[in-house]
């Protein structure tokens, strides 16, 4: 890391899919700050926030699968970068426009119309609304898709709308 930074080849360092213990272990071997952690996150992959919403409950959402990486990242000023934000499951497909998720897509369409956006734009706005300032890795090189998603950066969903989408994605609130 030191040589990469010193030579100017890398300005900032981060990790991917690491929990707090793994980040701390890596920090014992490098001097450069770890500023980013790329994690799967989106409306159909909400585990990172579920445990915080379901504290002291006994339902599936209350189980901590990542050792509190969201809280750790916020405390340590590590930016989370959401990869595959439009996927459901582990690369099972895209949820936007998918007939398997009629309730979610109905809500995405509703808010897209309200905010003069697209369902994909609203899915990004949902991520952007989280107070952790999560960055979205959109994974496209198609200019029209980049423009549609970039336009969503101006959308600020109301808190009730954020939770409405969270529940439409199949999540419950305690």
Language model regions located:
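Beta/alpha (TIM)-barrel catalytic core signal, keyed to glycine-rich beta->alpha loops juxtaposed to Asp/Glu
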Residues: 1-174
């Amino acid at each position: 890391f030191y040589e990469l930074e010193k030579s100017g080849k890398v300005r900032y360092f981060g990790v991917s899919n690491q929990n707090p213990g793994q980040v701390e272990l890596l920090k014992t071997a490098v001097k450069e700050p770890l500023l980013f952690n790329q994690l799967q996150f989106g409306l159909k992959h909400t585990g990172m926030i579920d445990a915080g919403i379901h504290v002291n409950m006994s339902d599936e959402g209350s189980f901590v699968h990542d050792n509190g990486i969201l809280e750790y990242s916020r405390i340590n000023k590590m930016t989370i970068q959401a990869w595959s934000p439009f996927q459901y499951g582990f690369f099972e497909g895209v949820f936007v426009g998918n007939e398997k998720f009629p309730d979610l897509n109905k809500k995405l369409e509703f808010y897209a119309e309200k905010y003069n956006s697209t369902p994909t734009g609203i899915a990004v706005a949902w991520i952007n609304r989280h107070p952790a300032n999560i960055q979205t890795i959109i994974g496209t090189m198609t200019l029209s898709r980049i423009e549609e998603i970039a336009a969503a950066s101006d959308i600020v969903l109301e808190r009730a709308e954020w939770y409405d989408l969270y529940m439409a994605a199949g999540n419950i609130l305690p």
